Amino acid sequence: MAGFMKNAMSYLGMSDVVDDEDDYIEEDEEQKPASKSAFDSDHTVTPLASTTAPAASSTTKPFPGGRVNRITTIHPKSYEDAQLVGRALRDGVPVVLNLTGVAEAVAYRIVDFSAGVVFGVRGSLERVTPRVFLLSPAQVNIKVEEPTKPASAHDLFAD
């Protein structure tokens, strides 16, 4: 126990540094020199043939490019429906995610999953309303305009 206290006090800077290495002095034993034949050999090393990366598998599809010709609207009923979001974004289709019919805890899980998918495809996620989101893949650019608030109720319908 005294050794522990010495080490603790030394660690906290309350005493001199304990040098435990001096406690265990071993007698120098005669060491046999290693045989030269163990390290030097006449065997030659044959280099391996360089390998190239395997070609892309036939199941891999290139990421779709070009114009977007459809948008998918998803109204999930449970967390299991979140995979529909992942499939659509993987295929390059923008998704409108409407969470109005889902419990709040499930909606948070779906948004979390969807945000991960959007990150994975390098896309973007925009909140349209508190429970409706627009998720778009990388090749789709979304222009977000901040709505201007009317000065008064009379200006609400003014052109």
Curated annotation (Swiss-Prot):
Keywords: Cell cycle, Cell division, Cytoplasm, Septation. InterPro entries: Cell_div_SepF, Cell_div_SepF/SepF-rel, SepF-like_sf. The keyword Cytoplasm applies. Residues 44-64 have a biased composition (Low complexity). GO terms for biological process: division septum assembly; FtsZ-dependent cytokinesis. GO terms for cellular component: cytoplasm. Gene3D superfamilies: SepF-like protein. Belongs to the SepF family. Homodimer. Interacts with FtsZ. Cell division protein that is part of the divisome complex and is recruited early to the Z-ring. Probably stimulates Z-ring formation, perhaps through the cross-linking of FtsZ protofilaments. Its function overlaps with FtsA. HAMAP family: SepF. PANTHER family: CELL DIVISION PROTEIN SEPF. This is Cell division protein SepF. It comes from Bifidobacterium longum (strain NCC 2705).
